[in-house]
């Protein structure tokens, strides 16, 4: 089981029925296929259990996990530039004239197509967890763009996907700032030793504190000067550590050893059973964390 490292959280904006059996058929229409000789990139669905299963979904207790794979061809700009310049020089020498800009632009496409079959590929996988009980979708990635790209693939697969980023009633940065200023956090949480503070002004400064007591005069000075906390490292129930950001994304998830070892009694050779047990454990813990965090930050914005 690949334990999630990050969470970009989205709310289903209206009630839709997402059933694993139906989704399995829909995902099969867009399974991942490798890039052809002239493809720059390809994206599609693969089994969340990797080579251990052909199933494109895995479900338990109303939780569904799916996995998108992307292949991108790597063509460094200097390589393209060098090949293009060589081609331009040869043509200009052969024809005894300078090429026009439109001709050079056309040549660039030719050069790209000639280089593509020899380009290296970069592969990436993005896990997505659908909580049908609470109407949430979580994407295991650190960037909003990557999350939106993965959601776009799912939207294309299903035909529609009404989701919006999870939004809270109160500005997150103001709540986080008050937690650091007062040293008092929501029940079940504990301040760790890392934060980022930003000035409210457009071109204001940024302070990144690491391995530092956040409830200190030094940090208080920055808050008094008008900076707000935009990232904050927290511990939840001594079970999960993470960084909460002002866009409600959760980064650098770290599960305690006791939690990760909870299913050690299951034979590792039985991959499917261990995957299922870890998936149930992880989603149960993260669903509880998200609920506690949303409540602690003042509740979800009314839709």
From Swiss-Prot:
One annotated Gene Ontology cellular component of this protein: bacterial nucleoid
InterPro entries (alphabetical): RdgC
UniProt keywords, alphabetically: Cytoplasm, DNA recombination
Membrane-spanning ranges: none
Subcellular location: Cytoplasm, Nucleoid
A Pfam family this chain is assigned to: RdgC
One GO term of the biological process aspect: regulation of DNA recombination
Gene Ontology terms for molecular function: double-stranded DNA binding
Family: Belongs to the RdgC family.
PANTHER family: RECOMBINATION-ASSOCIATED PROTEIN RDGC
Purpose of the protein: May be involved in recombination.
Full protein name: Recombination-associated protein RdgC
Organism of origin: Klebsiella pneumoniae subsp. pneumoniae (strain ATCC 700721 / MGH 78578)
């Amino acid at each position: 089981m690949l334990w999630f490292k990050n969470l970009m959280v989205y709310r289903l904006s209206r009630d839709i029925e997402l059933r694993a059996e139906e989704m399995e058929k829909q995902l099969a229409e867009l399974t991942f296929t490798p890039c052809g000789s002239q493809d720059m990139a390809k994206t599609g669905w693969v089994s969340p259990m990797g080579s251990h299963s052909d199933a494109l979904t895995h479900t338990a207790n109303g939780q569904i996990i799916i996995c998108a794979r992307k292949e991108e061809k790597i063509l460094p700009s200097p390589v393209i530039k060098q090949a293009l310049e060589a081609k331009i020089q040869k043509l200009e020498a052969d024809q005894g004239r300078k090429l026009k800009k439109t001709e050079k632009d056309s040549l660039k496409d030719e050069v790209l197509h000639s280089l593509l079959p020899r380009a290296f590929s970069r592969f990436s996988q993005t896990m997505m967890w659908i909580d049908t009980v609470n109407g949430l979708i979580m994407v295991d990635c650190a960037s909003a763009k990557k999350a939106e790209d993965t959601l776009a693939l799912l939207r294309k697969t299903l035909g529609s996907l009404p989701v919006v980023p999870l939004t809270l009633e109160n500005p997150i940065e103001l709540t986080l700032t008050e937690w650091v200023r007062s040293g008092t956090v929501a029940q079940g949480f504990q301040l760790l030793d890392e934060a980022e503070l930003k000035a409210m002004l457009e071109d204001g400064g940024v302070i990144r504190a690491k391995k530092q007591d956040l409830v200190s005069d030094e940090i208080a000075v920055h808050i008094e000067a008008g900076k707000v906390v935009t990232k904050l490292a927290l511990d939840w129930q001594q079970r999960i550590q993470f960084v909460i950001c002002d866009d409600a994304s959760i980064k650098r998830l770290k599960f305690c050893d006791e939690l990760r070892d909870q299913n050690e009694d299951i034979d590792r050779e039985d991959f499917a059973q261990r995957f299922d047990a870890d998936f149930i454990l992880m989603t149960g813990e993260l669903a509880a964390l998200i609920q506690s965090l949303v409540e602690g930050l003042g509740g979800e914005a009314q839709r």
